[in-house]
A protein has these predicted regions:
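Membrane-interface micro-motifs in multi-pass membrane enzymes
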Residues: 1-3, 44-51, 102-104, 164-177, ...
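Transmembrane signal-anchor hairpin modules in multi-pass inner-membrane enzymes, especially those
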Residues: 1-89, 95-98, 102, 125-132, ...
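Alpha-helical transmembrane segments of multi-pass inner-membrane proteins
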Residues: 8-17, 57, 81-92, 109-116, ...
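Juxtamembrane membrane-interface segments at transmembrane alpha-helix termini
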Residues: 37-46, 90-91, 114-121, 141-150, ...
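Transmembrane helix-loop junctions in multipass membrane proteins, especially transporters and channels
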Residues: 41, 66-69, 95-99, 122, ...
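Transmembrane alpha-helices of multi-pass inner-membrane enzymes
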Residues: 55-60, 237, 243-244, 345-349, ...
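Long extracytoplasmic/lumenal interhelical loops at the membrane interface
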Residues: 159, 163, 265-281, 289, ...
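Hydrophobic transmembrane alpha-helices and their immediate junctions
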Residues: 230, 334-381, 404, 410
């Protein structure tokens, strides 16, 4: 029964996507972040929901009267498209081309849907709905994981929807870390039952992240919570409440969780931690051999380890490890051009958020932009911190932030300059206001 309900909901949304592509984009975001089909039991799990939803959005764009062309020209989008070019080049010269092209298709879908989001997001209402769908979809797994973690006393590991990019414990930890700023800031903007729902998802996401047993996720969680409190108008009561809550919670936290977190300070004695350091050395050796094109997607194999790091195979009894680092993974897979494009994309997003906050100072009708810029900056910071220890460089959310930031820049510049014709839009008003 559950399968029929999920499939029916998706199929019924397809005509909406054709005639109202923005709402089709919301359906796509819901599917991509909540994975409702993974909550079913049989045929819905393999039903191509995301593909059909994306096709309906693309079909709807054919009938769309206009597109947000100005947002596409923003530097964040340019860096993202340059990054996609390096994906393509690295796949042409990949060590394992058959595997690389399969992965290239998956990542190209992420980039394509981010471009479509840039085209479709045009005003505050649309950005709010888009971000709200993302927050509630990922937040659902925080709600579910938090209840599971508390019910089991933290003695079992919290996982995400399997099989998906968010399925592993490290992966769902990163996704929730990135989502928590959204839940917090959106709750400050909403009212009634929606505000309470967002707050519930936020607070249950804390034990959900903790009981993934991911040290990187716990570290990012601590940073996110600290910055949320420091940025709040009620920082003193929040910090006091967090300290008291933490002290009261310690007796109920499993000893094995505390022991695992303590290995952060004794990483030299931890096999898992040292394997990551050794694997980064392995990645650097490959990057030196493939500086311009990279080794391509999914380059890890026993044969490559035997060539570049045979001593690590001996050290870890023949086990082939993942990169466990978004930056080393990009560098090794796509070379230095891909690495610089990836870093620039993130830097441009962070800088633009700062410029947006500076630009809207004193503009009472644009205060909401500061809220969105704050939440996106914190979300990206969580991505960078947690990404130092996990492979999530192709996760959808950072690329969707590119779309949202580009659209926010267009909206702010349009409002500050009084020019409402996007074809005649220039970025000068935003940059001038931010200086």
């Amino acid at each position: 029964m559950r399968d029929y309900v999920v499939i029916g909901l998706v199929l019924s949304s397809l005509p909406i996507g054709l005639f109202r592509p923005f709402y089709g984009l919301l359906v796509y975001a819901w599917i991509s972040y909540m994975y409702p089909h993974m909550l079913a039991w049989s045929m819905a799990q393999t039903f191509p929901m995301a593909k059909l939803s994306s096709l309906s959005v693309m079909g709807g764009l054919l009938f769309s009267p206009s597109a947000n062309v100005a947002a596409l020209r923003q530097r964040e989008n340019v860096a993202m498209l340059l990054l996609w070019c390096t994906f393509t080049i690295s796949s042409v010269f990949a060590i394992y081309p058959d595997q690389a092209w399969v992965k290239w298709q998956d990542t190209s879908k992420v980039i394509l849907m981010s471009v479509l989001a840039t085209i479709l997001l045009r005003d505050r209402k649309q950005i709010r709905l888009f971000v709200l769908v993302i927050a509630l979809s990922i937040g659902f797994w925080g709600f579910k994981g938090g209840l599971f973690g508390l019910a089991t006393g933290g003695n079992q590991i919290v996982y995400g929807p399997e099989p998906s990019i968010m399925g592993a414990n490290n992966a769902i930890g990163l996704a929730l870390d990135m989502c928590m700023p959204l839940l917090w800031y959106l709750a400050s903007q909403e009212r009634g039952w929606l505000k309470r729902l967002l707050q519930t998802f936020f607070f249950l996401s804390i034990p959900a992240v903790m009981f993934t047993y991911s040290r990187g996720s716990t570290l990012a969680l601590a940073v996110v919570l600290l910055l949320i409190m420091l940025k709040s108008k009620h920082r003193i009561p929040l910090i006091f409440a967090m300290v008291i809550g933490g002290v009261l919670a310690v007796p109920f936290i499993p000893q094995k969780w505390l022991e695992r977190q303590q290995t952060v300070f004794t990483y030299g004695e931890d096999t898992s931690a040292m394997s990551r350091v050794d694997n980064w050395k392995f990645c650097w050796r490959i990057a030196q051999d493939y500086p311009l094109t990279g080794a391509g997607f999914d380059f890890q194999s026993r044969q490559i380890f035997e060539k570049y790091a045979p001593e690590f195979l001996v050290k870890y009894n023949g086990k082939v490890w993942n990169t466990h680092n978004i930056f080393f993974s990009i560098l090794t897979s796509h070379g230095f051009p891909g690495f610089f494009a990836f870093v620039l994309m993130i830097l441009f997003c962070m800088i633009s958020c700062t410029q947006l906050k500076m630009a809207v100072r004193g503009a009472s009708d644009l205060v909401w932009v500061k809220t969105y810029a704050d939440m996106i900056q914190l979300s990206l910071l969580a991505f960078v911190i947690n990404g130092m220890f996990v492979n999530m460089e192709y996760f959808d959310l950072p690329y969707h932030w590119v779309s949202v930031i580009a659209c926010l820049k267009v909206i702010v510049s349009r409002e500050l300059s009084g020019v409402h014709d996007e074809e005649s839009y220039v970025s000068a008003p935003l940059e001038a206001a931010a200086t």
